[in-house]
Design a protein with these regions (language model features):
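Pyridoxal 5′-phosphate
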Residues: 1-272
């Protein structure tokens, strides 16, 4: 996603590093393409769990192991998957893992989550706010300015983290996701997208093989490209999907049902 490009481009310019972008593999096997690019010249790999345009899946356990073998670091933005697809941090072993709270986390805008590996939990934060300083919980002593930070990853918190509007929404979303179960969400959505993919293939809309994409994500491509006005026509039918790159991105959730799928397919038949 662009957010995971711009920040690294800026950092590379500051420190004289080179950004290497892996082009879309012809076979759409991103894992093999990433593994082939890893060598001793790599310092950091900034990756998702699945691609934001079509759901192309990456084997993060294999990639993480390959990076550690050459002394490189793994930074993950899993906004496109967290909340809908399981990830085992103990096996992947990312150095940093970030995710926005909205999208599959079902939370509000303006919040995000950050995991920091133990070896980086004593680093210097990007934001110099007061609440991340040592002893900030003692309001009576705030006049005694502190140079040290809160222990561990707490030092990386944003300012105004005690947001009385956003935090309750985020907590409610997390509780709902845990109640449903992430593995069950993935299994249910994988069945739903497989059904959509099968019905759309006869319309000339081609999905990635199920083995190469995340179960909750479907990107449909068409030879010759998607027709102009596609989204506007679907919107007029009350159907909300998006185009990302050359893919018609279809990402249903648990609230979508068979009738929604039938409505989508019927509308696509009229357009295509």
């Amino acid at each position: 996603f662009p957010s995971n490009v711009y920040c690294w481009s800026e950092r590379a310019a500051q420190c004289g590093a080179e950004i290497v972008t892996i082009p879309i593999p012809a076979d759409h096997d991103w894992t093999a393409a990433v593994l082939a690019a890893i060598d001793e010249t790599v310092a950091v790999a900034a990756l998702p769990h699945n691609h934001w345009t079509d759901g192309s899946l990456l084997d993060l356990e294999a990639i993480g192991a390959a990076l550690r073998a050459v002394g490189a670091k793994l930074v993950l933005d899993i906004t496109q998957s967290i909340g809908a697809m399981p990830i085992d941090v103990a096996k992947v072993k990312p150095d940093f893992l970030v995710a926005a709270c909205y999208k599959w986390m079902l939370g509000p805008y303006s919040l995000g989550f950050l995991y920091v590996a133990p070896e980086f939990q004593e680093g210097e934060p990007l934001e110099y706010n007061w609440i991340t300083r040592a002893g900030a919980e003692d309001f009576s002593a705030l006049v005694d300015y502190a140079d040290d930070y809160q222990p561990g990853a707490r030092r990386y918190d944003m300012g105004e983290r005690a947001n009385f509007s956003l935090m309750p929404m985020a907590i409610a979303a997390l509780e709902q996701l845990l109640d449903w179960g992430i593995a069950d969400i993935q299994m249910t959505l994988a069945a739903r997208t497989a059904d959509i993919a099968g019905k759309c293939e006869s319309l000339g809309l081609m999905p990635l093989p199920q083995s190469l994409r995340a179960g909750h994500f479907l990107g449909l491509r068409r030879e010759g490209g998607l027709p102009k006005g596609l989204l506007e026509t679907l919107l007029a039918e009350g159907i909300y999907i998006s185009v990302r790159g050359s893919s018609l991105r279809v990402t249903p959730h648990l609230f979508n049902n068979d009738a929604d799928v039938d409505k989508l397919v019927a509308a696509l038949k009229k357009i295509l």
